[in-house]
Amino acid sequence: TGRKTESEKELNYVLRAIDSWCEIAKKILREPESLSTSIPVLKLQNHYEPFPLVGVISGWCFPFAHLMKEIIPALLAGSAVIAKPSSITPRFVRTLNHTIHRTRGLREVLSIVEGTDDILEPLCSNSDFVCYNGTATEARQVSDIAHQLFKPSSIQHGLKNTVIVTETADLENASSAILLGGFWNAGQSSSSIERVYVHRNVYHFLFYRIQFKSDFTK
């Protein structure tokens, strides 16, 4: 997209996410201990069974990070993954596919496909679990398809995120947080701030602090 800083941070986020999920997987995927019952000869044992194929559909905002945040835990859980990034932001797909195809063991379980909304239904119908991360409009579409096919799904989409500033809030921190949340990635983020509600007694001071700091924002 031409924004070097955001692209670097997006890549670094994915690298940190890989490390973080690997640590989490060590804990939650550990073989559970047998549980005793009231019958001495009978014990209970939990076994984890991954979904054979997880379908991932991601939006155009932070396209690489939002795609990988769904792929990483699915692979660690033992599932194969077929993923469709947004057709609006496809430039990273060729590089990602090149890396996947060069990596033994990964190319057998991970496939990145390109396409428009026309492939949403076949992708969902061939998946055992559907993950979506993107816009609210497309989230409804994916959710409807998954429900009609009786597919379990995880749907995450952007909302009108709100900040509430109370009378006793730290206004310096609040003004900086509002600017960061509103301007990060030029405001194109599923977690960007859309509304700010401020206590009337601190409204004017907060307004002028935001105005002052925004003059230095590039």
How should each PLM-predicted stretch be described?
Residues 1-42:
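N-terminal Rossmann-like NAD(P)+-binding subdomain of aldehyde/semialdehyde dehydrogenases
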Residues 35-103:
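Conserved small-residue-rich beta-alpha loop and adjacent elements
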Residues 43-44, 111-129:
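A structured beta-alpha segment of the ubiquitous adenosine-cofactor-binding alpha/beta core
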Residues 53, 107-110:
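Short acidic capping loops at alpha-helix termini that bridge into adjacent secondary structure
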Residues 54, 61, 114-122, 134-141:
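Beta-loop-alpha module in the N-terminal Rossmann-like domain of NAD(P)-dependent dehydrogenases
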Residues 71-72, 120, 175:
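Generic hydrophobic/aromatic pocket-lining and core-packing "Φ" positions
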Residues 72, 129-133:
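Periplasmic-binding protein-like
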Residues 104, 128-129, 137-218:
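ALDH superfamily catalytic-core signature
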